[in-house]
């Protein structure tokens, strides 16, 4: 058995009378790839929103690298290294790629960070993951594929 890097334990989430998730538990070990499969409305997106701290579970807990994340705090998830590529784009169309990345990772990059440093970090990440992006391009001018790359970054 390898090192558990992500643990969801007993996750339950209700929306009124609707049970979106009921006692969901899973472990992800270092080096594993995990896919959630299910029909529309099965609760996959709800579970991911709980992992990322956008929703608060009614019961259960989320651990990343052995540390329990406080419920409903996306900033804590980001600080722990959890990222989220949203099902629907969440980019600000009137901002540049660089401005969107800075905005989306506020807990990681302070707005006080000089653009030059932020640009360098963005380009290093893009290069590391082979994602071609233009930091100065307005999101409104990007193709769907380019917007997806920005979401990943």
How does the language model describe each region?
Residues 1-153:
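Glycine-rich phosphate-binding loops of nucleotide-dependent enzymes
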């Amino acid at each position: 058995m390898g090192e558990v890097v992500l643990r969801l334990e007993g996750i339950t989430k209700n929306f009124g009378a609707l049970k979106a998730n009921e006692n969901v538990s899973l472990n992800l070990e270092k080096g594993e790839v995990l896919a959630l499969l299910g029909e529309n409305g099965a609760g996959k997106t709800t579970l991911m929103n709980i992992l990322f701290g956008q929703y608060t579970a009614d019961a259960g807990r989320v651990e990343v690298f052995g540390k329990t994340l406080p419920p409903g705090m996306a900033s804590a998830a980001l600080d722990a290294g959890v990222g989220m590529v949203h099902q629907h784009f969440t980019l600000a169309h009137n901002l540049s790629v660089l401005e969107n990345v800075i905005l989306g990772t506020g807990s990681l990059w302070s707005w006080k960070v000089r653009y030059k440093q932020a640009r360098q970090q963005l380009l290093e990440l893009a290069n590391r993951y082979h994602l071609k992006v233009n930091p100065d391009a307005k999101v409104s001018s990007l193709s769907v594929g380019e917007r997806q790359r920005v979401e990943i970054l």
